[in-house]
């Protein structure tokens, strides 16, 4: 289901925390549709994206955009040489990007359908502001090890309050429980 969503969207957004912790590929792995992988958009306050990451190594002109607030000139040059589009943007309360402004800038770059694969904090912030049209909640039946550090999703109150239409999706492809919420 994730790869189908990636195929259907022309851009995909994550935070640098997700990128550095998970080292995702953020591509469409459906046979024959790989060329339709979305542009990768990363929110990275201080250009902390690891240069050993898959995203950095596979960046080329036009497929990777990073929003940042501040970084050394050396770091900026390194990223630009890889073909990464850097967009300098201010932070709200010196902590978060203005997501509405990020959306406007992404739109100006020709991106019309944005898939956000975010962790707890970013998802909750966007849900709170009612900026999603649709929200897919994937729930794995696997219990994560207590040895792993992770943040459990705690944005349910915003999800239930702001997104009244709810549909269970049965993909028959895996054991994940998927619920689609719409405004």
What are these regions (language model features)?
Residues 1-183:
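Enzymes that bind and transform nitrogen-containing heteroaromatic metabolites
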């Amino acid at each position: 289901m994730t790869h189908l969503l990636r195929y259907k969207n022309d851009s995909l957004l994550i935070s640098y925390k997700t990128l550095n912790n998970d080292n995702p590929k953020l591509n469409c792995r459906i046979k024959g549709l790989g060329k339709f992988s979305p542009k990768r958009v990363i929110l990275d306050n201080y250009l902390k994206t690891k240069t050993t990451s898959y995203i950095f190594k596979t960046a080329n002109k036009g497929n990777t955009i990073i929003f940042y607030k501040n970084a050394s000139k050396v770091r900026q040059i390194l990223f630009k040489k890889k073909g990464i589009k850097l967009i300098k943007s201010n932070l709200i309360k010196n902590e978060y990007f203005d997501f509405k402004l990020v959306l406007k800038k992404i739109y100006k770059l020709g991106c019309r359908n944005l898939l956000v694969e975010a962790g707890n904090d970013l998802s909750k912030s966007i849900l709170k502001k009612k900026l999603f049209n649709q929200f897919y909640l994937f729930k794995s039946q696997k219990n994560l090890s207590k040895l792993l550090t992770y943040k459990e999703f705690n944005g349910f109150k915003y999800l239930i309050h702001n997104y009244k239409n709810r549909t269970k999706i049965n993909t028959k492809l895996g054991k994940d429980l998927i619920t689609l919420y719409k405004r």
